[in-house]
């Protein structure tokens, strides 16, 4: 049997982080996932999918992913049921996320330019743009920085392409 879920969507609210009596971290959140088609009025609808994540991943999600963040998750579908205060049986279907990944940079989420150079996360740090073979330095690209952000378009003729 296979029970595997992969979702990419935006968080509809900040994750709610709680701890079980045995001190296990658990976070609940929901993702708005766009459908692949448009409705009759030409608008793209979204599904709002309830998710839960456990342990260290729950703490990381609660600390780093906020409402509106574009998140990718992998996990599985789980159904459970309980009896509510009115004595009725309630069935819940949710995705148990086993891992997550933030899919956009912090600068993009906070309204900045994703291609802006930020000196590897150190503001106002002097930059050393000279590289010598003996220095053994590698460029320090931060997570938010594109190494090709300041490049110019290449001038290639069709004759130079191998296909």
Swiss-Prot record:
Low complexity composition-biased segments: 111-135
One Gene Ontology biological process: DNA replication
Domain SSB: 1-104
Cellular component aspect of the GO annotation: nucleoid
Keyword NAD applies: no
Single GO molecular function: single-stranded DNA binding
Positions of short motif Important for interaction with partner proteins: 158-163
The entry's keywords: DNA damage, DNA recombination, DNA repair, DNA replication, DNA-binding
Listed Pfam families: SSB
Region (Disordered): 106-163
Highest taxon above the source species: Bacteria
Keyword S-adenosyl-L-methionine: no
Function: Plays an important role in DNA replication, recombination and repair. Binds to ssDNA and to an array of partner proteins to recruit them to their sites of action during DNA metabolism.
Record's subunit section: Homotetramer.
Name of this protein: Single-stranded DNA-binding protein 1
Annotated gene: ssb1
């Amino acid at each position: 049997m296979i029970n595997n879920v992969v979702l990419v969507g935006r968080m509809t609210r900040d994750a709610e982080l709680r701890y079980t009596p045995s001190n296990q971290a658990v976070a609940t959140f929901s993702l708005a996932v766009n459908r692949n088609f448009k409705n009759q009025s030409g608008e793209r609808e979204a599904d709002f999918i309830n998710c839960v994540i456990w342990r260290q991943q729950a703490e990381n999600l609660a600390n780093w992913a906020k409402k509106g963040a574009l998140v990718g998750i992998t996990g599985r579908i789980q159904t459970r049921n309980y009896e509510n205060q009115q004595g009725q049986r309630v069935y819940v279907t949710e995705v148990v996320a086993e891992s997550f990944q933030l899919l956009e940079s912090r600068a993009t989420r906070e309204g900045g330019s994703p291609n802006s150079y930020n000196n590897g996360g150190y503001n106002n740090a002097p930059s050393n743009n000279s590289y010598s073979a003996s220095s053994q330095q590698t460029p320090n690209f931060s997570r938010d920085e594109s190494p090709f952000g300041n490049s110019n378009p290449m001038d290639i003729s069709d004759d130079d392409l191998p296909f």
